[in-house]
Structure formats: C-alpha cells, structure tokens
Design a protein with these regions (language model features):
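Lipid interaction determinants
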Residues: 18-86, 90-144
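Positively charged n-region of N-terminal signal peptides that target proteins for export
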Residues: 1-4
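Sec-dependent N-terminal signal peptides
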Residues: 6-8
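C-terminal motif of bacterial Sec signal peptides marking the signal peptidase cleavage site
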Residues: 13-16
Length: 144
C-alpha cells in the first residue's frame, strides 16, 4: 500500500511539472509598435543604400503617409504613388515591414519585405539582403 501511495505521489508531482516554456514563442513582437508609430504623421526616406549605391536622392522630394488601413501614399508636388504596407512577424527569426508599390521607378527599389532593425518615434531602420546579388540594402524612414 505504501509503495502504491509513493508511486501515485510521484506520478502526480511529475505531471504537475511541465517542461514547456511559454517564453520561447517562435514569433516575436519586439517591433509590433511599428503599426501605431508609422501612421502618426509624415515620413521621408533619409537613407536608401543598395549594396554600394546610395539611392537616397531618388526619394528626396517624397513624403510618405502610412495609414492604419495598410495603405501608404508617397507624394511630392508633381506625383503621387499609392502602395500598401504591413507588419509581419510570421518568421521565426525576424520581424518585417512589407512595402508594396507599383513597378514605377524609383518605387520598385523599395518593394520588399524589409527586416526591422530598430524603431523609435522619429526613425525606422530597415534592412534586406537582396535576392538577386546578395547585397545588403538599408532603408531608413525619418519622421518629418
């Protein structure tokens, strides 16, 4: 009887202990605040580097307005380009800002799933490894 009682207690204690760890979630949300920061005001591209090429000047006259419905508008005095944006944390190793504009130059340069590097209320830093040539691309939005 004593052996059965000890065995039963051992089973109860063992089943109460769990090896699962909820802190090891595959998807992180470190940068989820991007969904509330981007729609607050207008932004401009303060840096766009594609490998060894600085393409920042191609966007110097454009202001970007990110809307809560996932649309984005890039606008200057003469031209407006509409696109979409979304935050994606479905990858197990990074969080991304996905930007999609038409294939109009120069906006085809920023159509990508950008890895979020850092976020503040005034600056968003992104990076990507180019699928074509493996070059590092850097994109920074700064709040106006």
């Amino acid at each position: 009887m004593k052996k059965i009682l000890i065995l039963a207690l051992t089973v109860i204690i063992a089943s109460a202990c769990s090896s699962s760890d909820d802190s090891g979630d595959v998807n992180t949300s470190e940068f989820e605040e991007i969904t509330t920061i981007l729609p607050q005001g207008k932004w401009f591209i303060s840096r766009l580097i594609d490998g060894n090429s600085d393409k920042t000047s191609e966007f110097e006259s454009f202001d970007f307005t990110f809307n809560t419905d996932g649309t984005v508008k890039a606008q200057n005095d003469l031209f407006t380009e509409n696109g979409t944006w979304n935050y994606d944390n479905s990858s197990s190793d990074d969080e991304e800002l996905v930007l999609q504009f038409g294939n109009t130059t120069p906006f085809d340069e920023i159509n990508d799933d950008w890895e979020i590097v850092s976020i503040s209320n005034s600056q968003i830093e992104l990076s990507d490894i180019s699928g074509g040539d493996g070059d590092l691309e850097l994109l920074t939005f700064t709040k106006l």
